[in-house]
């Protein structure tokens, strides 16, 4: 791109982590193997840093498509007013109906956000990139009506702290 006249380039890299679009919680900086794995990821980081290109790794701290170590889709998710796991469905653009073929996403309880951010930051040794972007924390705001109730204003405070920590 630089060879073709693009002078200012900034990368916001999405779906780069282990699980890709499956939305595993980013508790470590493990690259998706389908993108070349850790070796290629480190080489890309070095090349971008050498060329002075800022890179922001996108992190999703609100959505899970399945359980993972330490985060169960039954216990770590937010709960609806009916006390059932809060789920976000995907919709077909053509009909606005729920897409029954697409995986739905469980919404992580705001109470779990700080834990996930701390785990991620604890796993980072050398940060060879510019920073993080946390798109979903800026796009969604929801309550958790589970045992440990979290209202929207409390969720906003928790997410603001998470963004500050990142």
Regions found by a protein language model. Give the residues of each.
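Catalytic cores of secreted/periplasmic lytic hydrolases that degrade extracellular macromolecules
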Residues: 5
């Amino acid at each position: 791109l630089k060879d073709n006249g693009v002078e200012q380039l900034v990368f916001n890299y999405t779906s780069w982590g282990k699980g890709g679009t499956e939305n595993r919680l980013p508790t470590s900086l493990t690259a998706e193997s389908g993108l070349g794995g850790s070796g290629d990821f480190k080489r890309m980081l070095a090349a971008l840093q050498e060329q002075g290109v800022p890179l922001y790794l996108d992190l999703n701290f609100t959505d899970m498509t399945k359980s993972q170590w330490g985060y169960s889709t039954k216990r770590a998710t937010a709960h609806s007013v009916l006390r059932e796991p809060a789920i976000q469905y995907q919709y077909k653009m053509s009909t606005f109906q729920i897409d029954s073929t697409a995986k739905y996403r469980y919404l992580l309880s705001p109470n779990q956000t700080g834990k996930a951010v701390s785990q991620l930051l604890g796993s980072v040794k050398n940060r060879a990139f510019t920073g993080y972007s946390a798109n979903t924390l800026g796009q969604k705001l929801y309550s958790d009506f589970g045992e440990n109730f979290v209202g929207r204003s409390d969720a906003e405070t928790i997410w603001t702290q998470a963004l500050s920590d990142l």
